[in-house]
Amino acid sequence: AYPDARPAQLRGWHRLWVRIEGAAHVFLSVLPEEGTVIDGLIAAVPGADWVALDTRETNYDRIGSNGAVVHDIIPAPDMAHYSVPTDTHVTSGDHTILLSYLDVVVQGFLREYGIDGVQRFFDTTRGWDTPILNDRAAPKYPRAQELTAQETALVDQHLPRLSAQVQ
């Protein structure tokens, strides 16, 4: 968690679940697309230690945002976002979305953007045809969080609307 995180939007990129070779589970990523805007967060990198963040985000490339981030910081600092390189994407396999990962993402969107933000997250994210592994009883996502009953219900209510398959 970053204490100085704040809401922001990323212009010209869309969000999607991506499969990569050698991983059992998919990753949430972004790809360039003209005319799109997605919600997210910005935060200072603790201790400006980009190497540590790059190590944590090992399957992602750090990309300079070059003014694509809409935010309220003046003067605007240099910013970057992370994307899984397209040359590592695979289109088939037994990959799954970890429900514990999705839960954490939705919990964050709810806290930062409210119910409407959660709706926008589901609506602006692609790849819901990937099966979802219900690992809530024994989370496999390393940064899993405990959700309230209301947060869990919010996640669960969106999945049928997207024809998502929970295993």
Question: Which residues make up each language-model segment?
Answer:
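A glycine-rich, hydrophobic/aromatic-adjacent loop/helix-cap motif
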Residues: 1-167
